[in-house]
Amino acid sequence: MQKEKKSIISSLLLITATAIWGFAFVAQSEAMKHIEPFTMNGLRSLLAAIFLIPVVMVSDTLKGKKITLFGTNEPERRKDLLLGGLLCGIFVTVASSIQQIGIQYTTVGKAGFLTTAYIVFVPVISLILGKKINRNGWVAVVVALVGMFLLCVQTFGSFSVNKGDVLMIISSLFFAIHILVIDKFVSHTDPIRMSCIQFFICAIVCLVCAFIFEQPNLSSIFDAWFAIFFAGVLSAGVGYTLQIVAQKNIPAHITPIIMSLESVFSLIAGVIVLNEKMSWQERIGCILIFIAIIVAQTDFKELKAKFNKTNADNKTAVLKADESNEKTEE
């Protein structure tokens, strides 16, 4: 019962993260009108890392722990924390950077759909690594993919593959590896500290790349300050940290299915903020993604067992009542 409760809470945390990411998409789109990709990623990651430092301190205080750099005296846990944070930082940097480059050569709809290829990559890589995926998981993957296709690809006849599409798929592969790295380390490390390290790594790499490949200037940065703040504190600092915390109690193959809600929330954000209209195709896509999440999270064998037990108990109660009535009549 306690395990189910933790799983439900973690799912709600991950859904909250996807809602933040979906609404942050509008802010990020606005920021790209003023600053370039590496500058945007670097600044928002730096802001996220700084934001998480007091969060770590408050978390330790609430737990009654002494505030230290690593949060543990165990050398093995320190090593895992640093390695997990380093790997997460590298993979999220590579994934988001390739995505920003790839989106210049493809449509937004196709980019959104191809990015969600991590829905397939995560269970396939898990299978290669020897982890079993139940039937529900595979059914949910297929349903979610169909939903994402309807949501993101508006013109069926024009679906062709170009350089941008290939880059988006490669980006999705690195997002999948990022999810699996979190799954590997999160059970025995502090998730908030790991997220903080992740963003310091991402900030350093992206800002170095920004000064090499781009021409960042203060005027443009000030023009995009609200979008950077929103993306840094909420999308990165809160959203990605909620993802890491949630993955403690959610199987790796279910995580990307829930994360696919990001596209649903970005669509809702477009309707609310930009007054965009939602087509019947997009509505069906949203419904299919919700169905996929329910299928992935539901243990149908357990439900069937409970249903059979309830029926058996009801039949037993009826038989006992009949026997009691017969004795009364005698």
Question: Across the structure, where does each feature detected by a protein language model lie?
Answer:
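Hydrophobic/small/kink-forming positions within alpha-helical transmembrane segments
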Residues: A19-G22, V26, I53, G89, ...
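Specific transmembrane alpha-helical segments of multi-pass solute transporters/efflux pumps
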Residues: A24-F25, V56-T115, L150, G232-I250
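Hydrophobic/aromatic residues within transmembrane alpha-helices
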Residues: A31, M40, R44, G102, ...
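C-terminal-most transmembrane helix of multi-pass membrane proteins
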Residues: K3, S7, S45-L46, I53, ...
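Helix-helix packing/entry segments at the starts of transmembrane helices
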Residues: N41-L43, A111-A117, I182-A203, A236-I272
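Hydrophobic transmembrane alpha-helices of multi-pass small-molecule transport proteins
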Residues: L52, I133-V153, S172, C206, ...
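Glycine-/small-residue-enriched transmembrane alpha-helix faces in small-molecule transporters
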Residues: M1-L43, G89-I90, V94, I98, ...
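Hydrophobic alpha-helical transmembrane segments of multi-pass integral membrane proteins
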Residues: I8-L13, T39-V58, L83, G137-V143, ...
